Each structure stands twice: as structure tokens, then as C-alpha cells.
A protein has these predicted regions:
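Rieske [2Fe-2S] iron-sulfur-binding domain
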Residues: 2-86
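C-terminal catalytic domain of Rieske-type non-heme iron oxygenases
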Residues: 67-270
Length: 270
């Protein structure tokens, strides 16, 4: 706040202005002070402001030059407000460099070990991964596994969609990284021999894992996670079960990344 330096995040929006929660100073969307009880504010410096767009249930902030902000760069989250999809997720504060999370999300071989009880399986390690750069702003890694047993998480998903969970499946993982810090991962399984990734909806369960990362410091980040699915979208119990499962999975990542960050900080010359 331009008045006494209080965090404006503790304020509230009043009549289209942001009111400081300390002494009631109000600033407009440009950061200019407009009013304060019993105080002249014309000489107050501006609070810093940013280019902001609210879209798809998220607030997107461009921290650099406002003139360089391009809302067209915001990814198209096709499932938002779409009754054919269901979505839920959460937020973690993680004490690790955000780049460690990018590495984690783009190399899913760690699932075999970190997430052995849910989504991990040996075939992830055994199946070659393809990496490609698309245009100037997207890196894609993909892995397709055929005629394997579904891991526990995907068996649950198959059952929730009325599909047998005790038959071989084809599984896929397609990770899409767009700098600086968001990753969308297409994941799913289909009954083996039904077309895999391209199988008809009645033979598969598939989802989009949402990973949006806001770097905080050199050693910390805010991690927005979630899963959008296009099977049985109206069943709230399935949504809750998937969210619970994801929370456990990403908590395992949190533990690993925070300890990795600690080691990197303790042994910088390693």
C-alpha cells in the first residue's frame, strides 16, 4: 500500500477499487490512490499494477511489461463450463525451485518409484519416450504402452466408467510444456486392441492433468494441480475420489522435491 506499506492482499474490493485493510486507502486498477478517510492522497505514489485476465476459473497475471501481455497465449481449457467434462483440483505451496517441478512433470519415469501404489508401473521405465518441439513455444513428451495391466488408479477409473478393470489395457501419457511454467498432461487407458489413444469413448477412460506453477522465490513455488475428465462427469463421488487420489500423488511429489531442493542448496558444488 502506498500509505504505510501494508499488503494490499489483506484488503478487499469496494466499488471497483481495492481498499487497503489497514487504513482504508483505495486504489484503482492502475494503482493510483483515489481516496482515504481524512487524508489527501494526490501525492501518494502509485501501487504497482499488472496485466490481469480472469479466464477458465483462474486469474492469469503477466508480471512484465503490460504492453507485451498477450491474452491469446493463455491455454484453451476446453473443459471449463463444459457439461461433458468434470474438473477439480487444489493448490500446494512447495519449497522447491519451480524448475524441479517442470522436470518432474515432463519425465514421468519417476512414477514407477514415487507413485508405486497408484499410477506407477514398470512399463513406464521400459517403454521409450518420444520428445519433440512444436513451434517456438511447446515441448511434448509422449509414451504409449500396449497390452499391460492397469495400475490401481486406472483400475478405479475403469470401474467408475462401467468398464472391466481386469483385462489388459493400452496406456498413454502425453506431456505438453509451454514456457514459462505450465504443463498439461493427457493420460488414459483403453481396453487393449480397441485403438488406444484413439479408441472410442466407450472403450476408454482419459483425462487431462492440469499443472500450473507460479514461481515465488528461487526456492519456492505455488503449484495449482487438478484433473479434468471426460468420463462419467456427473458423478460427484468419482470427482471426489480422483481429487483425493491426486492429492496423495502430488503430496508424494512435494516431499521428494522439497528434499531434493534441500540437498541442492546444501551441496551447491556437487
Amino acid at each position: 500500500c502506498p500509505h504505510r506499506g501494508a499488503p494490499l492482499s489483506l484488503g478487499k474490493v469496494c466499488d471497483g477499487h481495492l481498499q487497503c485493510g489497514y487504513h482504508g486507502l483505495r486504489v484503482d486498477c492502475t494503482g493510483k490512490s483515489v481516496s482515504m478517510p481524512g487524508q489527501r492522497v494526490q501525492a501518494f505514489p502509485k501501487a504497482r499494477s499488472f496485466a490481469v485476465v480472469e479466464r477458465y476459473g483462474f486469474i492469469w497475471v503477466w508480471p512484465g511489461d503490460k504492453d507485451a501481455a498477450d491474452a491469446a497465449l493463455i491455454p484453451n481449457l476446453q473443459w471449463h463450463d463444459n457439461p461433458e467434462w468434470a474438473y477439480d483440483g487444489g493448490l500446494f505451496h512447495i519449497k522447491a525451485d519451480y524448475r524441479l517441478m517442470i522436470d518432474n512433470l515432463m519425465d514421468l519415469t519417476h512414477e514407477t518409484y514415487v507413485h508405486a501404489s497408484s499410477i506407477g508401473q514398470a512399463e513406464i521405465d521400459e517403454t521409450p519416450c518420444k520428445t519433440e518441439v512444436i513451434g517456438e513455444s511447446e515441448v511434448v513428451t509422449s509414451r504409449f504402452m500396449e497390452n499391460i495391466e492397469a495400475p490401481p488408479f486406472w483400475k478405479m477409473a475403469l470401474r467408475s466408467n462401467g468398464l472391466a478393470d481386469d483385462v489388459p489395457v493400452d496406456r498413454w501419457q502425453v506431456c505438453r510444456f509451454t514456457p514459462p511454467s505450465h504443463v498439461l498432461i493427457e493420460v488414459g487407458v483403453a481396453h487393449a486392441g480397441k485403438g488406444g489413444y484413439d479408441a472410442a469413448d466407450e472403450h476408454k477412460v482419459y483425462s487431462m492433468v492440469v499443472d500450473f506453477i507460479t514461481p515465488e522465490t528461487d526456492g519456492s513455488m505455488w503449484y495449482f494441480w487438478g484433473m479434468a475428465r471426460k468420463f462419467n462427469p456427473g458423478d460427484a463421488s468419482v470427482t471426489a475420489a480422483i481429487k483425493q487420489g491426486q492429492h496423495k500423488i502430488f503430496s508424494e511429489d512435494l516431499e521428494m522435491l522439497e528434499l531434493q531442493q534441500r540437498n541442492l542448496a546444501d551441496y551447491p558444488d556437487r
